[in-house]
């Protein structure tokens, strides 16, 4: 069913609001994907707070006009699903992980930090650990010397007690 003008304006406004908050946009061709698989992809995207939507390319072009993602308009051809996220790597990670298990989803392009990326660029972005993973690694690295020092002090205290007894 075709959208009337008001519906199109509402879609453009909704997508523009998402794009205004976004750090990353990923485009992927979804030709031939089963409905059940697409539903799984949408569920994974929701878990990661990724806005995932199939859009008419003309509406998507209007939504990205005047944003850092405007250069992506050249890539907006064919049946595309758009992944938009505030997290720098979430959209790339969700789409890339799903494309590994489903060869019918083909990453076409992406944009991060005002730069357009090809498939290899999106895959490289997806391979970066998330902020939470990096923070946990940093905490482990910072905690390791402290815990080693504490164990050394405890061993020294036990040794002193053994000598005193």
Swiss-Prot record:
Gene Ontology MF terms in the entry: large ribosomal subunit rRNA binding
GO process annotations (BP): translation
InterPro entries on file: Ribosomal_uL10 (IPR001790), Ribosomal_uL10-like_sf (IPR043141), Ribosomal_uL10_bac (IPR022973), Ribosomal_uL10_bac_type (IPR047865)
GO cellular-component term (any): ribonucleoprotein complex
Transmembrane segments: none
Keyword Ribonucleoprotein attached: yes
Signal peptide, first to last residue: none
Alphabetized Pfam families for the sequence: Ribosomal_L10 (PF00466)
SUPFAM superfamilies in alphabetical order: Ribosomal protein L10-like (SSF160369)
Key words, A-Z: Ribonucleoprotein, Ribosomal protein, RNA-binding, rRNA-binding
Keyword Acetylation: no
Function of the protein: Forms part of the ribosomal stalk, playing a central role in the interaction of the ribosome with GTP-bound translation factors.
Subunit comment: Part of the ribosomal stalk of the 50S ribosomal subunit. The N-terminus interacts with L11 and the large rRNA to form the base of the stalk. The C-terminus forms an elongated spine to which L12 dimers bind in a sequential fashion forming a multimeric L10(L12)X complex.
UniProt record similarity statement: Belongs to the universal ribosomal protein uL10 family.
Protein's name according to its UniProt entry: Large ribosomal subunit protein uL10
């Amino acid at each position: 069913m075709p959208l009337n003008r008001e519906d199109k304006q509402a879609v453009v406004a909704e997508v523009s609001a998402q794009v205004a908050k976004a750090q990353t946009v990923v485009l992927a061709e979804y030709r031939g994907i089963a409905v059940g698989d697409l539903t799984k992809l949408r569920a994974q995207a929701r878990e990661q707070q990724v806005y995932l939507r199939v859009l008419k390319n003309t509406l998507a072009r209007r939504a990205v006009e005047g944003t850092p993602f405007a250069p992506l308009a050249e890539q907006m051809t064919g049946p595309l699903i758009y992944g938009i996220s505030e997290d720098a790597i979430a959209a790339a990670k969700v789409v890339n992980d799903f494309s590994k298990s489903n060869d019918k989803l083909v990453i076409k392009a992406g944009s991060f930090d005002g730069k357009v990326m090809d498939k290899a660029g999106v895959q490289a972005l997806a391979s970066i650990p998330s902020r939470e993973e990096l923070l946990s690694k940093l905490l482990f690295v910072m905690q390791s010397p402290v815990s080693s020092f504490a164990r050394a002090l405890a061993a020294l205290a036990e040794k002193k007690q053994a000598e005193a007894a």
